[in-house]
Curated annotation (Swiss-Prot):
Family of the protein in this entry: Belongs to the methyltransferase superfamily. tRNA (adenine-N(6)-)-methyltransferase family.
Name of this protein: tRNA1(Val) (adenine(37)-N6)-methyltransferase
Reported function: Specifically methylates the adenine in position 37 of tRNA(1)(Val) (anticodon cmo5UAC).
Cellular compartments annotated: Cytoplasm
GO CC terms in record: cytoplasm
Cystine pairings recorded for this chain: none
Keyword Cytoplasm: yes
EC number(s) given by UniProt: 2.1.1.223
Amino acid sequence: MSGFAFKQFKVAHEQCAMKVSTDGILLGAWANLSNANSLLDIGTGTGLLALMCKQRSPQLTITAVEVDKNAYQQALQNIAASPWPNIEVHQQSIQTFNSAQPFDVVIANPPYFNHSLKGNNKARNIARHTDGLSFAELISAFKKLSHAGSTFSLILPTTEVAVFIELATQNGLFLNTHCQVKATPNKAISRSLMTFSYINQSIVESALCIKDNENNYSEDYIALCKAFYLKM
């Protein structure tokens, strides 16, 4: 199996354009799930985020949406082989997805390349570029599928953060928590973990280095992810 083995589940990813990545692991471990009963994973890919969140909060009712047929099939297989086969997966675009009940938490590791050159792999282009799911459409989907107390957590490259925050603000959303991520202490900030809601409150800021100066996983990263990695 081509994939990644975690402590409680395995994720095959050979059929997916976007493989298991540190971005996904960061978001799945970091997202605030407190007081939540329902969660929507937008663009689930391998099913990684849905599985991580279910491990963290087994009481969650989780729904995952994936537009790509091969990734959808892979997510189904990964979820069926996990301890939580009742995670629901839909093959359709989030733009056309509807739910009778709003979700408490929405989570996404979205496409983020706005103006970059594309390769020949159509599925990978869809997974990585905003043509198939723009930031505006992502925010619109959250607003359609949420309630007044819902939260929206995502991870983005630092270069896209200002644009996303501006769009979110224009749509009545507020940044509540923001964790800036570096690969190592001497590297520039490369990623931002963010949670938005309809509530205007003081932003909780934090920082995280994935590895230390000796190229070992940092204490903070281990504390965040040790429930998942086999060798932590």
